[in-house]
Design a protein with these regions (language model features):
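A glycine-centered beta->alpha junction motif in the catalytic cores
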Residues: 61-68, 112-130, 148-149, 270-281, ...
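ATP-dependent phospho-/nucleotidyl transfer catalytic cores
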Residues: 120-232, 243
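Regulatory N- and C-terminal appendages and interdomain linkers associated
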Residues: 1-37, 53, 154-157, 327-432
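Short helix/strand-bridging catalytic loops that position acidic/His residues to coordinate divalent metals
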Residues: 67-73, 122-131, 249-257, 263, ...
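Active-site acidic catalytic loop and adjacent metal/ATP-binding pocket
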Residues: 36-51, 56-58, 216-262
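Active-site activation/catalytic loop segments of kinase-like enzymes and analogous catalytic loops
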Residues: 84, 261-337, 359-375
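Conserved NTP-binding catalytic cores of kinases and kinase-like/nucleotidyltransferase enzymes
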Residues: 1-108, 116, 244, 411-432
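Conserved ATP-binding subdomain of kinase catalytic cores across diverse folds
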Residues: 45, 50-175, 310-317
Length: 432
């Protein structure tokens, strides 16, 4: 759809029309509406329609990958999954998810809440050097509530299996993820690109390292087979809008049941990419602030997740009406404080190393694969950009390998310390 057809659509839809027109609009005159295409993503069109009564967003899923073209087809059914994910995530975390007003499956068109300025895409805010004081805590809370609430820690086995079956139908979007994150960066692929010639040797090492490819393949296996919770599926800083006071998570069209660490790692990776980019943009002081937010985000997530888990166990023990006793680590089995503590520690350790691994493969793919991040791409000096990218690749490959050995960087504070070492060190000449 284009701007003209979008306006016609809104005017002919009672729900949407009511949201943008005011009672004082003169029915004898052309409706005072404006439309602007604002999407800067890789696969959709996004329009803002404004009138005297308010603003709404209309998002249309294209039948191909926008950043590649019609040669790469993509299912429009993803819009259905996006709507369902927004509804579920808003149920669990209403303060951080926009409202869906309308969905037209035949056109793959979603009408939703307009998130007004000063909110802006978080990636752009970080590139501009803004210091939003609450976004890290908000995103940690979003992860805790949505991952716990859709997992076997909160649901019974029958319910979870039904949900896994339902969300497994979003297989086309999962297949895209599998290709661009777990496969393409490790082979010769026409869609891959990198800063050349500065990163030629680095990209070659990634494609030739058997150890790295094995670790990435094991992470891919977990992505394919581990159905822990309903994931956003593409939770980067471009899928978040934020301001001084508010944060919203948007664009969950890749949603599926998968390993929790994939969503956690997605945010860690994007904040780390932002961190390394600051050497060529906003400087060391702001870089340190970004790294501090990375720590806050994960600490908030871990604390919130464990509190939800502990509260669920307390309610199950007290037989609170309506309280769920999750199938995994049932209260009747883990009936002492020590057993709960051990169970939680083991679970969170595995989740942490999963998160590191998924963060690593995402960092790698954003530098030598398809669909790079503006944090780095907008550094116009190729030598400065490649210096930042080399540091990010060094840490990214370390994280992928650590996810399998589970030796070192056992908490987010240690991750931050290692990131500081890489940031402050000389420009890496190799990944080994």
């Amino acid at each position: 759809m284009d701007a003209t057809s979008i306006l016609d659509y809104v005017l002919n839809n009672t729900t949407l029309r009511r949201l943008v027109l005011s009672d004082g609009d003169d029915a004898s005159q052309p409706p005072p509406l404006s439309v602007k295409e604002v999407g800067d993503g890789n696969i959709n069109f996004v329009f803002v329609v404004s009138g005297n009564g308010g603003c709404i967003v209309l998002k249309q899923a294209l039948p191909f990958v926008r950043c590649v073209g019609e040669s790469w087809p993509l299912t429009q059914q993803r819009a259905t999954f996006e709507v369902n994910a927004l509804v579920e995530q808003r149920r669990l975390c209403p303060e951080l998810v926009p409202i869906v007003y309308h969905f037209d499956a035949s056109k793959a068109l979603i009408g939703m809440q307009f998130i007004a300025p000063p909110n802006m895409i978080l990636r752009r805010a970080l590139m501009a050097g803004h210091r939003y004081p609450h976004f890290a805590q908000h995103l940690g809370t979003f992860l805790a509530k949505t991952l716990f609430g859709t997992s076997l820690l909160a649901l019974d086995g029958v319910t979870l299996r039904a949900k896994v079956a339902e969300w497994s139908a979003n297989s086309a979007m999962c297949a895209l993820t599998e290709k661009v994150i777990f496969d393409d960066p490790y082979i010769e692929c026409r869609h891959n690109r990198w800063t050349s010639p500065q990163l030629d040797a680095f990209s070659g090492l990634i494609r030739s390292s058997t150890e790295l490819k094995v670790a990435a393949a094991l992470l891919k296996g977990k992505f394919l087979s581990c159905t822990q919770a309903l994931l956003h599926g593409d939770l980067h800083t471009g899928s978040v809008m934020a301001s001084e006071k508010t944060t919203y998570v948007i664009d969950p069209e890749f949603a599926f049941y998968g390993p929790m660490g994939f969503d956690v790692g997605a945010l860690l990776s994007n904040l780390l990419l932002s961190y390394f980019s600051q050497a060529a943009t906003n400087g060391a002081d702001y870089a340190e602030w970004v790294l501090e937010q990375t720590v806050i985000l994960h600490q908030t997530f871990a604390a919130g997740f464990l509190e939800l888990w502990s509260e669920s166990l307390r309610q199950a023990e007290a037989s609170v009406a309506g309280a769920g006793d999750g199938e995994h680590f049932k209260a009747a089995v883990f009936d002492t404080a020590r057993s709960v503590e051990r169970a939680q520690a083991a679970f969170m350790q595995n989740l942490w190393y999963d998160s590191l691994g998924f963060a690593g493969v995402k960092m790698i793919r954003r530098i030598v694969g398809l669909a790079h991040v503006a944090d780095l791409e907008d550094i116009h000096d190729a030598d400065k950009r490649s210096d930042c990218e080399k540091r990010a690749l060094l840490l990214g490959t370390e994280l992928v390998l650590l996810s399998q050995s589970q030796q070192g960087l056992s908490c987010v504070l240690q991750l931050a310390d290692r990131a500081r070492q890489v940031y402050a060190g000389s420009t890496p000449q190799s990944l080994v």
